[in-house]
Amino acid sequence: MKEGIHPDYREVLFIDVSNDFKFVTRSTIQTRETAEFEGKTYPLAKIEVSSESHPFYTGQQKIMDTAGRVEKFRNKFGSRATGKAVAK
């Protein structure tokens, strides 16, 4: 492999901010924050959804924050988005 062209593949601490679940895995993500976990310092990546909080994996329904995205879409496109497609 050529030197200097590949991203740094290292252990990173991921924290699910919705339930404070933490896990370490290898990643190339770039982050400025670090955190201590099990006596070792890792680069820190904060995520909103993980397997510990996603409804598919937990079997429980939780309200996900998607309403903001829908409202943003409606504000941007207005009534054009609700019109029916014309068949050719």
Swiss-Prot record:
Q: Does the record bear Ribosomal protein in its keywords?
A: yes
Signal peptide bounds: none
Q: Which GO terms describe its cellular component?
A: ribonucleoprotein complex; ribosome
- Keywords of this entry: Ribonucleoprotein, Ribosomal protein
Q: Which domain of life is it from?
A: Bacteria
Alphabetized GO MF terms: structural constituent of ribosome
Matching InterPro entries: Ribosomal_bL28/bL31-like_sf, Ribosomal_bL31, Ribosomal_bL31_B, Ribosomal_bL31_sf
Q: Which GO terms describe its biological process?
A: translation
Subunit annotation: Part of the 50S ribosomal subunit.
Tell me which PANTHER family the record gives.
50S RIBOSOMAL PROTEIN L31, CHLOROPLASTIC (PTHR33280), LARGE RIBOSOMAL SUBUNIT PROTEIN BL31C (PTHR33280:SF1)
Similarity remark = Belongs to the bacterial ribosomal protein bL31 family. Type B subfamily.
Q: What is this protein called?
A: Large ribosomal subunit protein bL31B
Q: Which organism is it from?
A: Paraburkholderia phytofirmans (strain DSM 17436 / LMG 22146 / PsJN)
